[in-house]
Amino acid sequence: MHSDAAAVNFQLNSHLSTLASIHKIYHTLNKLNLTEDVGQDDHQTGSLRSCSSSDCFSKVMPPRKKRRPASGDDLSAKKSRHDSMYRKYESTRIKTEEEAFSSKRCLEWFYEYAGTEDAVGPEGMEKFCEDIGVEPENVVMLVLAWKLDAQNMGYFTLQEWLKGMTSLQCDTTEKLRTTLDYLRSLLNDTTNFKLIYRYAFDFAREKDQRSLDINTAKCMLGLLLGKIWPLFPVFHQFLEQSKYKVINKDQWCNVLEFSRTISLDLSNYDEDGAWPVLLDEFVEWYKDKQMS
């Protein structure tokens, strides 16, 4: 009897312990919101329902949006943007290449006027002046010749052309046209003007002569001083009636100095100064002309 009672007590205690554990688990799950009332029958029978893993995940993370496939319009817009960017790139690249100086292009440009020769001659020079929109007698052509360091009037050799045009970064007619204003501006600088004036003497003279013939001298003086020296008309008149057939380089250089330093009434001219006889005679002739 005693052993039977003990066995009953043991089984009873085991059931109670199991019920206590189940009750504890139920309360724990309830705190975690993992249980729900699923109707009166479930409540009465004490049954439990835990949420599935997908239900729990949806409470934490928002639903993922599905990516829609690109429409035909979107693809067309992307292609249009790509084409536009490519055209812009190509336009910039081509423009850069055109702006960059090219020795090859400069050489081809030279032979447009030189033909099969190694120098641009009178005929080619005439066409060249026509293309850049400048008369051959325009002073800017003298400045260009100076920049090219041309040695003979009416001619540009291949070496002079390549060296000078490279320094100017001109390899086409269009580029030189846009450079003409710069070349003209060099005449406004006192130092550059003096260099160009001195260069003009050697450029214009016959290479087997040390002096410049009087007719060429009058033309070159008119080109350089005609618009900036008020006394040039009377000086030109003096040369016309004088006995001089040529002008040497010393006389040439002193004419520029005279035009810059001597007043229009010649009152500051020193007859005992180191002026050439040519200018002494001009001053005397001009004063006599004023008195008569």
Curated annotation (Swiss-Prot):
Residues 40-83 are annotated as: Disordered. One of its GO terms (biological process) is positive regulation of protein neddylation. There is a cross-link at residue 95 (Glycyl lysine isopeptide (Lys-Gly) (interchain with G-Cter in SUMO2)). GO terms for molecular function: cullin family protein binding. Keywords: Isopeptide bond, Nucleus, Ubl conjugation. Residues 102-287 form the DCUN1 domain. Its main location: nucleus. Residues 47-58 have a biased composition (Low complexity). It is found in: Nucleus. It holds the Pfam family Cullin_binding. GO terms for cellular component: nucleus. Highest levels of expression are in the testis. Very low levels of expression in other tissues such as the heart, brain, kidney, liver, lung and ovary. InterPro entries: DCN-prot, DCN1-like_PONY, PONY_dom. Contributes to the neddylation of all cullins by transferring NEDD8 from N-terminally acetylated NEDD8-conjugating E2s enzyme to different cullin C-terminal domain-RBX complexes which are necessary for the activation of cullin-RING E3 ubiquitin ligases (CRLs). The DCUN1 domain, also known as PONY domain, mediates the interaction with different cullins. The DCUN1 domain mediates the interaction with the N-terminally acetylated NEDD8-conjugating E2s enzyme leading to the NEDD8 transfer from N-terminally acetylated NEDD8-conjugating E2s enzyme to different cullin C-terminal domain-RBX complexes; the neddylation efficiency correlates with the DCUN1D5-cullin and DCUN1D5-E2 interaction affinities. Interacts (via the DCUN1 domain) with the unneddylated cullins: interacts with CUL1, CUL2, CUL3, CUL4A, CUL4B and CUL5; these interactions promote the cullin neddylation and the identity of the cullin dictates the affinity of the interaction. Interacts with RBX1 and RNF7. Interacts with CAND1; this interaction is bridged by cullins such as CUL3 and strongly inhibits the neddylation of CUL3. These CAND-cullin-DCNL complexes can only be neddylated in the presence of a substrate adapter. This is DCN1-like protein 4. It comes from Mus musculus.
